[in-house]
Amino acid sequence: MIVIKDAHFLTSSSQLFQCPASLTSEMVILGRSNVGKSSFINTLLGKNLAKSSATPGKTRLANFFSTTWEDKENALTTTFNVIDLPGFGYAKVSKSLKKEWEGFLWELLSVRISIKLFIHLVDARHLDLEIDKNAKENIQALLRPDQAYLSLFTKFDKLNKNEQHRLFLNAPKPFLINTTHFNALSSKYPTLEIVRQTLLKYLLTNPL
């Protein structure tokens, strides 16, 4: 069982020199505006730390959170950072992710050696948006051998049972979701515990 021993806000950065020192592995959370990024982070960490922006697209800040997870089964305690990036795709005409994030944010993703895992949140109701395809391509083009990219589907509980099953069958594995009520889902779908275990496994594969 994974227990979140600590989770707290570190800092917000708009320039590289403002970012915390790269002393521990880091997980980046990215996704379109209104995809449910804050909800996912708060569910994952068991604490209301991430706030939704009142003006999507206006603030180009990266928010850093320090977290400590205990894997009781394996008697392992790990500290790492979660980086919450601003939502993309807020413009009426979607630009490329690289264009929206040119400057600080793109530089952060390109050069920060402590980033080990990218979690791309995708709205389960809107699977084929160009901006998400572009984001996936851009992030995968950045990946170093010691980094991983995973998709995670938000708003899974907004789908009917047939839609949930179809997504489960066709989505890339590992199949990861966020939902308001994990316990209300069929047992074939991942629980919050499984989501945490999966993310921790990827982070520990290539420690800093």
Curated annotation (Swiss-Prot):
Family (UniProt): Belongs to the TRAFAC class TrmE-Era-EngA-EngB-Septin-like GTPase superfamily. EngB GTPase family.
Superkingdom, taxonomy of origin: Bacteria
GO molecular-function term, one example from the UniProt record: GTP binding
Coiled-coil residue windows: none
Annotated binding of GTP, by residue: 31-38, 57-61, 84-87, 154-157, 182-184
Protein name (Swiss-Prot/TrEMBL): Probable GTP-binding protein EngB
Known role: Necessary for normal cell division and for the maintenance of normal septation.
Any one GO cellular component localisation term in the record: cytosol
PROSITE patterns membership: G_ENGB (PS51706)
InterPro entries recorded: G_ENGB_dom (IPR030393), GTP-bd (IPR006073), GTP-bd_ribosome_bio_YsxC (IPR019987), P-loop_NTPase (IPR027417)
Keyword Nucleotide-binding recorded: yes
Binding annotation for Mg(2+): S38, T59
Residue span, EngB-type G domain: 23-205
GO biological process: division septum assembly
One matching Pfam family: MMR_HSR1
Keywords: Cell cycle, Cell division, GTP-binding, Magnesium, Metal-binding, Nucleotide-binding, Septation
